[in-house]
Amino acid sequence: QQIGSEDGEPPQQRVTGTLVLAVFSAVLGSLQFGYNIGVINAPQKVIEQSYNETWLGRQGPNGPGSIPPGTLTTLWALSVAIFSVGGMFSSFLLGIISQWLGRKKAMLFNNTLAVLAGALMGLAKAAASYEMLILGRFLIGAYSGLASGLVPMYVGEIAPTHLRGALGTLNQLA
């Protein structure tokens, strides 16, 4: 729909409910980025204890004992840092994926990464596998890297010209 202008400016499109819903849905996915940067820190001791239990379970009753401190530190550092590696890796593929699938389908594909990552991280303790947690962190990092580029592109494409700048900044605010 167009709104006429009496002062000679070009007509502007109205903000519709569909536009608000589409922008809100797209930008809501960006919350995963900030959440997953910080969420790993609070349960550090619980995760380290789980790593130790997994280590002991794999060693058997005659194993050397609990996980060496250096190995635990390395596993913990990898668990935290792999998020950024996943984001960096996927950001290199952003252009290829967005051109291949289009913005909307690429965001839908990206959501499968988030679901898979959540499943891996959620089941890691039950499966006694710190590798699942690390892989899940890599995949959620890949999700975040793709979302950081796909969401602003998508919002910029669907937003009316006069609102493009304002709506484009919502990704950073989420």
UniProtKB/Swiss-Prot annotation:
The modification Phosphoserine is found at S5. Its main location: membrane. Residues 2-8 are annotated as: Interaction with SRFBP1. Glycans are attached at N52. GO terms for cellular component: cytoplasmic vesicle membrane; endomembrane system; insulin-responsive compartment; perinuclear region of cytoplasm; plasma membrane. Sumoylated. The keyword Protein transport does not apply. InterPro entries: Glc_transpt_4, GLUT, MFS_dom, MFS_sugar_transport-like, MFS_trans_sf, Sugar/inositol_transpt, Sugar_transporter_CS. Insulin-stimulated phosphorylation of TBC1D4 is required for GLUT4 translocation. The dileucine internalization motif is critical for intracellular sequestration. Belongs to the major facilitator superfamily. Sugar transporter (TC 2.A.1.1) family. Glucose transporter subfamily. This is Solute carrier family 2, facilitated glucose transporter member 4. It comes from Sus scrofa (Pig).
